């Protein structure tokens, strides 16, 4: 597919700003949601320049300075920065691992306070690769509604499952008892971070949803940050999303299998992952995570992230990108495992 051709639409030379985004772009996103089983009307969608901006808009909508949001642990470290820029505090709820990952709903309930304005879920989570299950989604909606908190559902990696699972919630978009904002974007869904287009879809009780949309429209109108060319290109790009996703999905799955095969029978354990672009390797705590990262970089020529970047509760975990070219990933994985064997 020629992405540049889609960006060359002459209509992009006309500037006709719409705070929520051009209707054809929003209609293309509704079709993308429909593929995941959700019927989302175009007037439920608001475009942003990135999912980070979508978070920023949501925090402006939901929070006053000093309010709190709940985020998963372990997860992506950007939440602290996004919240801090809005003078919002971050508390965490744990994801537990017992062979598979799951939300500790009881601890989430304990973490909710009168100043909690939103609960963030990432499905699949980065870096654990765990999807929110339908049973967890129902519990989350009930808890959020009881505490008058919104749900921010980050679904940027939803198109990259590693296996099928009928218990999985394909999206948290549903008009349940809690205001819900579902986030996505071209950066992950089409592997095009340079195009800077993301979105949020609003669900929940009608009154709360309509008030949220009106207020978000004011926020978006204040910035008008989404470029016209990418909005014109979005329908053509999203129509070919499956073609863009397929090679990424194949590479990620293949690299994960290579890593599992390399680690088999060694002191290194590959944790279960259901989706996303990362793998987690549990290694012996004979070194600190920083020491593991440095020795692998300096002596083996392999780059990995330490688990504490993602707020793992204990050592020693290493996070690997599964996006590396296979001819680079396979020897890199072998060098990691060999280093672990020599250090155990």
Model-predicted segments: where are they?
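Helix C-cap/helix->beta junction micro-motif
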Residues: 86, 146-147, 266, 300, ...
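Conserved glycine-rich beta-strand-loop-beta hairpin in the small C-terminal domain of fold type I
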Residues: 235, 251-260, 270-283, 314
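A short helix->loop->beta-strand "cap" motif at the edges of active sites that frequently abuts
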Residues: 67, 88, 146-150, 177-178
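Conserved core segment of the aminotransferase class I/II
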Residues: 179-253, 340
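N-terminal small-domain helix-loop-helix segment of the aminotransferase-like
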Residues: 1-50, 57, 237-240, 303, ...
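Active-site phosphate-binding strand-loop segment of PLP-dependent enzymes
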Residues: 97-168
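PLP-dependent aminotransferase-like
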Residues: 60-121, 142
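PLP-dependent enzyme catalytic core of the Aspartate aminotransferase-like
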Residues: 109-110, 286, 295-304, 310-344
């Amino acid at each position: 597919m020629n992405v540049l051709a889609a960006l060359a639409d002459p209509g992009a030379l006309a500037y006709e700003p719409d705070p929520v985004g051009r209707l054809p772009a929003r209609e293309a996103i509704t079709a993308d949601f429909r593929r995941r089983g959700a019927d989302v009307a175009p007037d439920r969608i608001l475009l942003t320049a990135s999912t980070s901006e979508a978070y920023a808009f949501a925090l402006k909508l939901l929070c006053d300075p000093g309010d709190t949001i709940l985020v998963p642990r372990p997860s992506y470290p950007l939440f602290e920065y996004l919240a801090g820029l809005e003078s919002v505090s971050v508390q965490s709820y744990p994801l537990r691992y017992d062979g598979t990952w799951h939300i500790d709903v009881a601890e989430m309930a304990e973490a909710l306070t009168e100043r909690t304005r939103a609960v963030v879920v990432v499905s699949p989570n980065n870096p654990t690769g765990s999807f929110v299950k339908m049973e967890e989604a129902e519990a989350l909606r009930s808890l959020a509604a009881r505490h008058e908190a919104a749900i921010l559902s980050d679904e940027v990696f939803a198109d990259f499952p590693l296996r099928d699972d009928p218990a999985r919630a394909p999206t948290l978009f549903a008009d349940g008892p809690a205001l819900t904002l579902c986030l996505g974007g071209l950066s992950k869904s089409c592997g095009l971070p340079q195009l800077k287009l993301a979105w949020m879809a609003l669900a929940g009780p009608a009154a709360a949803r309509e008030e949220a949309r009106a207020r978000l429209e004011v926020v978006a109108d204040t910035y008008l940050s989404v470029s016209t060319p990418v909005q014109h290109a979005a329908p053509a790009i999203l129509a070919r999303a499956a073609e863009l996703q397929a090679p990424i999905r194949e590479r990620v799955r293949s690299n994960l299998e290579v890593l599992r095969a390399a680690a088999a029978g060694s002191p290194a354990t590959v944790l279960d992952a259901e989706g996303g672009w990362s793998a987690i390797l549990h290694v012996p705590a004979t070194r600190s995570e920083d020491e593991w990262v440095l020795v692998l970089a300096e002596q083996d020529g392999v780059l990995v992230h330490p688990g504490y970047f993602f707020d793992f509760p204990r050592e020693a975990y290493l996070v690997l990108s599964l996006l590396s070219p296979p001819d680079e990933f396979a020897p890199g994985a072998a060098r990691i495992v060999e280093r672990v064997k020599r250090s155990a």
